[in-house]
Amino acid sequence: MKNSLRTIRWLPYVTLLWFFGCCGLLLPSLISAESTPRILLINSDASVTKYKESQEAFKQVITQPIVEVDLGDKKWESSTIEDLLYDEDPDIIYCIGTKAYLLANKYVPKKNIVFSSIINWLRLPITDKTYGVSNELHAGMEMTLFRLIFPNVQKIGVLYSKKYTEEWFKNAQNQAKEMGVEIIGQAITNKKQNVSALKKLLPTVNAFWLISDPELLSTKEDLLTILQECAAEKTPVFSYHETFAELGATFTVSVDDPTIGRQAAGIVTGVLSGDKLDNKVQFPAGTYTVLNLKKVKEYGLQYNEGALDTINRIIQ
């Protein structure tokens, strides 16, 4: 009888121990579930090679689960994206391409958003929670590569707009001086001025640097017009997109897309860790170069043959 009473007295304590034991087992998983960040990746179109490469490189770095959305898939309409953004309630969103970014910014502008693969990001609506990797390289890096291949180029012409690229132009001018290069600029207010500005600029320079500026380029026709004007003067064109070399540009320095994805992953990791990022929008770290050797020979340009092995692709 005494043993039975003793057992009854201990029952409440045993029950409490069992309860806390269960809580102890469940607590780590609950904490883990709460602490795992919710990451959403929106790709404007995963069938585009450069977008896909950035996405794959991003996923190789990020170890946490990622919810992926391909806007190239017809099932994703604006309304379904809106529902997903609210349902998932992500801690951070990685947007590849302009379409992805604009959707995220439209529906959840107060969320942390990291972008990449967007030409001329300065034209986009941004918030204090916007981060990204620019699609435009550091001007000093580009000029270093220009001079490596064409060491005799001393004067480079640039068309720019006061609205989007005036600050970039001033910085590029200062960096060029340190390399012994003079950058001569012509400001425009809209693309209708392209031809007249080029006709004034080209006779004074050794090469033309075609930069990313929405006032300058908004259609393929704008690009072709500029390339044709430069070709008529046999002025080599340096630019920022590899496909331009196929259309007549002499030398292009573009971003390396897998590196872009890894950089974006680094930004995402930093933001989720609460790190203070000095540069919210970073310059790309990697490059991909194309030399149109056919144009070089057509124009009779002097070039550094010893540096050809540094070029990623040569058009013969």
Language-model regions, residue ranges each:
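N-terminal secretory signal peptides that target proteins for export/translocation
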Residues: M1-W10
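Sec-dependent N-terminal signal peptides
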Residues: R9-C22
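Intrinsically disordered, low-complexity serine/threonine-rich segments
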Residues: C22-C23, S32
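Residue-level detector of bioactive/disordered segments in secreted/extracellular proteins
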Residues: G24-L25, G97
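Short hydrophobic alpha-helices and adjacent helix-cap/hinge residues
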Residues: A33-Q316
